[in-house]
């Protein structure tokens, strides 16, 4: 990675505000994606579906992501995400989260890149097999 080419002077308060509603968006309101994600938004799920596919690869932009979230909630209506911790450092951020599927719990981490204005431009997401301890 070329450090100089990838330096962005990001509005950290706006970036943190985007992360503050990230899980609300996953849990209840896909419209939030249109406010906090950039037009060139991408998400990379590093855990594929059971059949080896990765529908997140087709997401490009906030509108596309909002549709993806609606589809996800239709397929997983009992999923509830909760924040463990988050941090923003310039153009980058991270969030540790837990998800509850009925009696099953797991944890994960999302790593974010932000635009200059604090919109989420890109996310790398990894889910684990056990929840984070809180």
What are these regions (language model features)?
Residues 1-134:
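C-terminal and inter-domain tail/linker signature
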